[in-house]
């Protein structure tokens, strides 16, 4: 089966200078992939020419005349820039020409345009960004990581249901464990939104294990961690900054003297393995959960190596039939979670979900 993906080549901080080289490298390593490069044709052609890939049959240029800037308000992307690379890429997925879209564009705009073009799955109020964070035994699914900075308690409940369905679909776990990210394990901790969300989760049939703290994120304490997009994005980027700092410190210390350089030479295999494990670029690419089609969000600041990983997330999700499996899991969950409404200050809600992923990935923010 040929995996067809659309690439929003103009998205992100670096545009075609990153997205096109990543696409070229990806198709050369994956002969069953076909990528549609969407954006300003002249800019894409210039990059392809530089890479001697103008005639590559696995790459197709799809012209778009507008670009959604990283600081464009959502309404501009949605109402004014109807021929943007982002919108055209999503339209091709909607029309069935491609199976997934990969974009490093403005997160708020991508979420809004994706919801408008692709629509949400039944029962989903707000799609969320989900990211698989590595832990000692595998990965922990965390959501939301930037799509919804302000959430009501029932939204956090729905994120938990979506995470439940995603892990159930990917891992075959009947009862994935759920944790609510908070400033303490005690039920009295947190703001009113978190406290109410905890009440809703405890009243649900989900396998809710209570509050988890920031130091639980990488321990594998639970299968799914739920939070609003503001907290989730800060936690994610703090982790990435820490990983980068550790790599820089190790490099600096081993370069201090001739003796330390000799020690580094002896320890090189270990250092290379360490560098690979903490390199956040290989976890780039997060799913927008709750849409009727697959959309993968890359970091806006991604380099070509990181963006290639985001493409791989979409490719793997299609190959593994993740959307179909999630849709089935959601249908099962709607039965297992019950049809009763969860009262949240007058807002009714019933449970389903949706998403992506096959191996540890990453996620985003409003500019991410």
UniProtKB/Swiss-Prot annotation:
<feature type="region of interest" description="Disordered">
    <location>
        <begin position="335"/>
        <end position="368"/>
    </location>
</feature>
<comment type="pathway">
    <text>Lipid metabolism; phospholipid metabolism.</text>
</comment>
<comment type="subunit">
    <text>Homodimer. Probably interacts with PlsY.</text>
</comment>
<keyword id="KW-0444">Lipid biosynthesis</keyword>
<keyword id="KW-0443">Lipid metabolism</keyword>
<comment type="function">
    <text>Catalyzes the reversible formation of acyl-phosphate (acyl-PO(4)) from acyl-[acyl-carrier-protein] (acyl-ACP). This enzyme utilizes acyl-ACP as fatty acyl donor, but not acyl-CoA.</text>
</comment>
<protein>
    <recommendedName>
        <fullName>Phosphate acyltransferase</fullName>
        <ecNumber>2.3.1.274</ecNumber>
    </recommendedName>
</protein>
<dbReference type="InterPro" id="IPR012281">
    <property type="entry name" value="Phospholipid_synth_PlsX-like"/>
</dbReference>
<comment type="similarity">
    <text>Belongs to the PlsX family.</text>
</comment>
<dbReference type="GO" id="GO:0005737">
    <property type="term" value="C:cytoplasm"/>
</dbReference>
<keyword id="KW-0594">Phospholipid biosynthesis</keyword>
<dbReference type="GO" id="GO:0006633">
    <property type="term" value="P:fatty acid biosynthetic process"/>
</dbReference>
<dbReference type="GO" id="GO:0043811">
    <property type="term" value="F:phosphate:acyl-[acyl carrier protein] acyltransferase activity"/>
</dbReference>
<dbReference type="Pfam" id="PF02504">
    <property type="entry name" value="FA_synthesis"/>
</dbReference>
<dbReference type="InterPro" id="IPR003664">
    <property type="entry name" value="FA_synthesis"/>
</dbReference>
<keyword id="KW-1208">Phospholipid metabolism</keyword>
<keyword id="KW-0963">Cytoplasm</keyword>
<keyword id="KW-0808">Transferase</keyword>
<dbReference type="GO" id="GO:0008654">
    <property type="term" value="P:phospholipid biosynthetic process"/>
</dbReference>
